[in-house]
């Protein structure tokens, strides 16, 4: 079976496959320059999309700004209807949308289908939240005054998204923004723009007004486009998922207009297994947590801390299970795990692997390049007894390297886990509820998952602390990041009767 047979998409609805930006309800190129979208599994070109200049971004911002003047006055029930339509359309087109993800991202089709279901759930959630944007009534000290608060949409939102979840990272942000009455300008990653364009097509079918949902495209001009979104006074909010370094740049650029920001940045998640944990459960959850997307998710376990009394057994059993993975092209039905996104990802895995080995880590599963499959295929690596001085204890690998560290006490492992500038997610496995509660409170992360390695859901507030960012996506809190709280006072009322 050759990989090249998968390089051109065959979709039930060919209209989902687009190669132009989307502004004001129109498919816009805006330039003769293009960049190529490549299937990371085969290395073959699957699309050529426009390298849009700053002028096109400014056009999209202007359109979103003008549309906001009317969109903000649509009723919550109207917006809920469009959001619900979007949810239904995503599920109706699940196979096509998942195929697009697999071709541009490289993940296995089963994982891609899971992403579409997860992504769609945010439209369903915010369809239900849109009519429930509440304020409060307040009795101030002055007996003749009455105060109440309302939440209003912040305005045009710039949404800058990563490649690892090409659909879900858009919906987590755009669904909340659209629900409260904001308009959006979306900049997808240049490696995975096709999912965003498919979503724009569905947004039109769902009934969203022209100009409320816009998608801009660029590879070489990406820094300029991001800077334009951050510095434009017409853009009132920027939300970004990606690296901490880029987040810091965007934050600096946004300071000139004091924008509302929400960032979901780098992670370095600890996965802690105490000696009393259910070992089978911890192993199954470690596999799901560490190797989902072949380790290319922001909440993947980057550091596994296993109690010294069970570390060798845990490492051996984990390796036995990981050996059963079937690495291959994501569209091959036999494949359980696809490829990594590019050669830089492989280079980082190998750098972290060799550094840990040089410092004394034991190789449990060698892993390595699978060049016979393609340039970006890599078998998982498992190392045990990794020293705390290894680079991987400080840096997020974002790939199929599983380093296992040893610990003896609760205090010791919490110290290890918190010894990082990142604080997105953490995992704790134990049968003792006191251990779970005590460690969860002590961990310096925005989210702690106990006895499960998969926790993300539209109903939970997703976000981090420290240099993993700020703001929350999903849940009843996620909608607040796209609103401003206004206080209204009515004064000089007569005495109460």
UniProtKB/Swiss-Prot annotation:
Source organism: Saccharomyces cerevisiae (strain ATCC 204508 / S288c)
Identification of the protein by name: Succinate-semialdehyde dehydrogenase [NADP(+)]
PROSITE patterns named in the record: ALDEHYDE_DEHYDR_GLU
Protein family: Belongs to the aldehyde dehydrogenase family.
UniProt GO cellular component terms: cytoplasm
Annotated localization: Cytoplasm
Assembly: Homotetramer.
pH dependence: Optimum pH is 8.4.
Pathway noted in the entry: Amino-acid degradation; 4-aminobutanoate degradation
Keyword NADP: yes
Site (Transition state stabilizer): 164
SUPFAM superfamilies for this protein: ALDH-like (SSF53720)
NCBIfam families in the cross-refs: SSADH (TIGR01780)
MF (Gene Ontology): succinate-semialdehyde dehydrogenase (NAD+) activity; succinate-semialdehyde dehydrogenase (NADP+) activity; succinate-semialdehyde dehydrogenase [NAD(P)+] activity
Highest rank taxon of the organism: Eukaryota
Keyword entries, A-Z: Cytoplasm, NADP, Oxidoreductase
């Amino acid at each position: 079976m050759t990989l090249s047979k998968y390089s051109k998409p065959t979709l039930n609805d060919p209209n989902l496959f687009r190669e132009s930006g989307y502004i004001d309800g129109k498919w816009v190129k805006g330039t003769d320059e293009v960049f190529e979208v490549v299937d990371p599994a085969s290395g073959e070109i699957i699309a050529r999309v426009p390298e849009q200049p700053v002028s096109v971004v400014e056009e999209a911002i202007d359109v979103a700004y003008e549309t906001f003047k009317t969109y903000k006055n649509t009723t919550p029930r109207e917006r809920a209807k469009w959001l619900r339509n979007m949810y239904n359309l995503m599920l109706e087109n699940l196979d096509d949308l998942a195929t697009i993800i697999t071709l541009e991202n490289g993940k296995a089709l089963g994982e891609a289908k899971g992403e579409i279901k997860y992504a769609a759930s945010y439209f369903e959630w915010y369809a239900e939240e849109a009519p429930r944007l509440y304020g409060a009534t307040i009795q101030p000290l002055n007996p003749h005054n009455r105060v109440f608060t309302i939440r209003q949409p912040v305005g045009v939102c710039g949404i800058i998204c990563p490649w690892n979840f090409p659909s879900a990272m858009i919906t987590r942000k755009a669904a909340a923004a659209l629900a409260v009455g904001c308009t959006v300008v979306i900049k997808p990653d240049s490696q995975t723009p096709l999912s965003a364009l498919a979503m724009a097509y569905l947004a039109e079918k769902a009934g969203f007004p022209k100009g409320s949902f816009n998608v801009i495209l660029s590879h070489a001009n990406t820094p300029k486009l991001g800077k334009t979104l951050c510095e434009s006074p017409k853009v009132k909010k920027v939300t970004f998922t990606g690296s901490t370094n880029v987040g810091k740049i965007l934050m600096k650029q946004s300071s000139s207009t004091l924008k509302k920001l929400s960032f979901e940045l780098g992670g370095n998640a600890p996965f802690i297994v105490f000696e009393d944990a259910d070992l089978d459960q911890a192993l199954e959850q470690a596999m799901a947590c560490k190797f989902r997307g072949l380790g290319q998710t922001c909440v993947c376990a980057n550091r596994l801390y296993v109690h010294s009394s069970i570390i060798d057994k845990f490492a051996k059993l984990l390796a036995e299970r990981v050996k059963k993975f079937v690495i291959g092209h994501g569209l091959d039905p036999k494949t359980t795990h696809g490829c990594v996104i590019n050669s830089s990802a492989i280079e980082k895995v190998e750098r972290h692997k060799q550094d840990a080995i040089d410092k004394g880590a034991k190789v449990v599963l060698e892993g390595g390049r699978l060049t016979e499959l393609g340039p970006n295929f890599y078998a998982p690596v498992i190392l045990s007894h990794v020293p705390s001085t290894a680079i991987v204890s400080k840096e997020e690998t974002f790939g199929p390297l599983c380093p296992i560290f040893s610990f003896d006490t609760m205090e010791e492992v919490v110290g290890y886990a918190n010894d990082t500038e990142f604080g997105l997610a953490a995992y704790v496995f134990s049968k003792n509820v006191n251990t779970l509660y005590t460690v969860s409170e002590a961990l310096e992360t925005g989210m702690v998952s106990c006895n499960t390695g998969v926790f993300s859901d539209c109903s939970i507030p997703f976000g981090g602390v420290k240099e993993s960012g700020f703001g929350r996506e999903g849940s009843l809190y996620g909608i607040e990041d796209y609103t401003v709280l206004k206080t209204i006072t009515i004064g000089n009322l007569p005495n109460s009767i």
